């Protein structure tokens, strides 16, 4: 049997409205891999950010798309051949979790937009998530029309047409629409075929400096462990460039807040890579794709409870600066979208003094606008971020009781 590198090589976001079946679809696609998370729990490294890895396989001698499967055994009893392993990022579809979806989008190479055939199109978060993909610049998209087993043919065809109308003029205009039933595992071969053709593994330069966006961090020590048994803190995230190996030096920015003579400042953390876990395997080195668990020499009190989520880690001396304030070019949407209360309205210009919620990479922070001019503004941040010039920033404004996506900024 052909061996496949089980480290995922591409991150695919699953986005869409709450209850449209994203998580069920992950289970159908990750096949026999769904129990790996309990294994991670036993080993003390749970690096699950709504992530699941799936190995796509092909049955020899069968034409596409019927040849595609996630099962190791084909229908005729022969062994399937692995093609590639992908990592699915399951983005929350609930409107209050939009910031989580946006921070996940920063590490997606492509996306599957899940739309239920049982409801009219678009639902609130379907629209908001598609707009977010458009803003962040994710162009490799496949649309899964889910739950087709729950409607009759006429309703399914009508819903299909609604989807076509909805995506017209958006980044998903040419995306294939695949009717599926995640619950009954119907048309998974067609969906894999579409993903294989529409969401290729990006060309990455292994010679670039290692850079990782931290999405989680934790202390894996059990209460009562002796000093000799203590392990360093673990950082979970996605490597976006370069290669990381056990023994490498690691710098983490912004780092931690220290109090110096009544003044607080942020100082980078420096440590070494003690262990690496990719997929559910311990590895000596890792490349971009999937979620990575990095065991470090850091005091576990610095990493517990996701304390380092949103930070950037990489080769010492190569990271962008830590910023307490920045200026950005602003591109606002025409209207506020994704509201279920019907408070959609025109997006007004950003004003000096107003608070904004900003997502930069996997970091979400609140900033106060210190100066606003047409097409640009300056913000002072409550929590600093590590970001380089040209970084994309998702801008959210308080509308009613919720934060709403109103545009995208480019750090200048």
Swiss-Prot record:
Residues 181-183 are annotated as: G5. GTP binds at residues 19-24, 146-149, 181-183. Belongs to the TRAFAC class translation factor GTPase superfamily. Classic translation factor GTPase family. EIF2G subfamily. Residues 90-93 are annotated as: G3. Mg(2+) 1 binds at residues 23, 46. Residues 16-23 are annotated as: G1. This is Translation initiation factor 2 subunit gamma. GO terms for molecular function: GTP binding; GTPase activity; metal ion binding; translation elongation factor activity; translation initiation factor activity; tRNA binding. The gene is eif2g. eIF-2 functions in the early steps of protein synthesis by forming a ternary complex with GTP and initiator tRNA. Mg(2+) 2 binds at residues 19, 44. The keyword Nucleotide-binding applies. Its cofactor is Mg(2+). HAMAP family: eIF_2_gamma (MF_00119). It catalyses: GTP + H2O = GDP + phosphate + H(+). Its EC number is 3.6.5.3. GO terms for biological process: formation of translation preinitiation complex. Residues 146-149 are annotated as: G4. Keywords: GTP-binding, Hydrolase, Initiation factor, Magnesium, Metal-binding, Nucleotide-binding, Protein biosynthesis. Residues 44-48 are annotated as: G2. It comes from the Archaea. Pfam families: eIF2_C (PF09173), GTP_EFTU (PF00009), GTP_EFTU_D2 (PF03144). One of its GO terms (cellular component) is cytosol. It comes from Halorubrum lacusprofundi (strain ATCC 49239 / DSM 5036 / JCM 8891 / ACAM 34). Residues 7-203 form the tr-type G domain.
């Amino acid at each position: 049997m052909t061996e496949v590198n089980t480290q995922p090589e591409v991150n695919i976001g699953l986005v869409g409205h709450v209850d449209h079946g994203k998580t069920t679809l992950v289970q159908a696609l990750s096949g026999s891999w769904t129990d790996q998370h309990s294994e991670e729990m036993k080993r003390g490294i749970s690096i699950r950010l709504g992530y699941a890895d799936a190995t796509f396989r092909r049955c020899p001698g069968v034409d596409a798309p019927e040849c595609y499967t996630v099962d190791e055994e084909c229908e005729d009893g022969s062994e399937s051949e692995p093609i590639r392993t992908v990592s699915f990022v399951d983005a929350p579809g609930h409107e209050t979790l939009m910031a989580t979806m946006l921070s996940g989008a920063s590490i997606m190479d492509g996306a599957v937009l899940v739309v239920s055939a049982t409801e009219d199109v678009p639902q609130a978060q379907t629209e908001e998530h598609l707009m977010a993909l458009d803003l962040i610049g994710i162009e490799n998209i496949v649309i899964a029309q889910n739950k087709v087993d729950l409607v009759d043919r006429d309703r399914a065809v009508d819903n299909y047409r609604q989807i076509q109308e909805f995506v017209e003029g958006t980044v998903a205009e040419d995306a294939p629409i695949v009717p599926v039933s995640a619950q009954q595992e119907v048309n998974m071969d067609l969906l894999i075929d579409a993903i294989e053709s529409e969401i290729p593994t990006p060309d990455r330069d292994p010679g670039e400096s290692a850079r990782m966006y931290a999405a989680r961090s934790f202390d894996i020590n059990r209460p009562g462990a002796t000093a000799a048994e203590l392990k360093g803190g673990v950082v979970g995230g996605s490597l976006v460039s370069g290669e990381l190996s056990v023994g490498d030096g690691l710098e983490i920015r912004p780092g931690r807040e220290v109090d110096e003579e009544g003044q607080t400042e942020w100082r980078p953390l420096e440590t070494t890579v003690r262990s690496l876990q990719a997929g559910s395997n311990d590895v000596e080195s890792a490349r971009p794709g999937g979620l990575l668990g990095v065991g470090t020499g850091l005091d576990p009190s610095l990493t517990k409870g996701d304390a380092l989520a949103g930070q950037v880690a990489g080769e010492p001396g190569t990271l962008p600066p830590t910023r307490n304030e920045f200026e950005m070019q602003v591109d606002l949407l025409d209207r506020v979208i994704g509201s279920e209360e019907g408070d959609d309205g025109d997006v007004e210009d950003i004003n000096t003094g107003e608070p904004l919620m900003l997502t930069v990479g996997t970091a979400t922070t609140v900033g106060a606008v210190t100066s606003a001019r047409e097409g640009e503004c300056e913000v002072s941040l409550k929590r600093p971020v590590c970001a380089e010039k040209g970084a994309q920033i998702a801008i959210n404004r308080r509308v009613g009781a919720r934060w709403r996506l109103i545009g995208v900024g480019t750090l200048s």
